[in-house]
Amino acid sequence: LIDAGKKGLGPSTAQSQINDMIVEYGLAGEQVVRPKGGDPTLFARLDEEIAALEGAGVNWNIGPGITAASAASAAIGQSLTERGRNSSVRFMTGHDMKGFAEHDWRELAKPGAVASVYMGKRSARFVQGRMLMYGAARDVPITVIENATRPDQRVVTTRLDRFSQDLEDAQLTGAALTIIGLKPRAAQSLVSEAKQDVVELA
């Protein structure tokens, strides 16, 4: 077992090193399993690893997983889509290779819009500012789920106008997913069932 994990804003294994390792062991005839913390097809650098394997002539396949947005929404007792509320949901990253990621903020600011922001802790103030700039209501619910579905899961519930400050105050250190437009439906039952921390800041 080789630890090749990544930690946002912390020590991480370089992607090039991961590519080299899976190619090296694959060429040596080993059966290599590259586990991901979610679904490997979403914000997981899958294409880079496939390109390295194909370049070396190593066969590969993909085992689908459950993406963090689905796990996190289930953990707070919510559905990502609801008839009459939203007919679509966005999976978006808080930042890209150029910095904070730009999105269709006008659509995200519309009533009923739901979005899941991956790797978004550092971009909270940016997302907040953009949505307010494009006319989003100040009381849009926002939920941040740290370590979704794990025993050490924490949930921060807030609203758009207090989003960045409340997130900073919560001092989350683990991997977190932000859901815009939804708040926990069953926080109290989740506390008893999963022994999670619920930080109510709204």
Stretch-by-stretch model annotation:
Residues 1, 20, 51, 77-83, ...:
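Short, hinge-like loop/turn segments at secondary-structure boundaries
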Residues 37-111, 154-157:
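Class I SAM-dependent methyltransferase SAM-binding "motif I" and its flanking Rossmann-like core
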Residues 1-63, 164, 176:
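Class I S-adenosyl-L-methionine
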Residues 5-10, 27-28, 62-65, 80-87, ...:
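Short, mixed-charge, low-aromatic patches
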Residues 17, 27-33, 45, 49, ...:
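A contiguous loop/helix-start segment that scaffolds small-molecule binding in enzyme catalytic cores
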Residues 4-6, 93-94, 147:
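Active-site donor-binding loop signature of nucleotide-sugar glycosyltransferases
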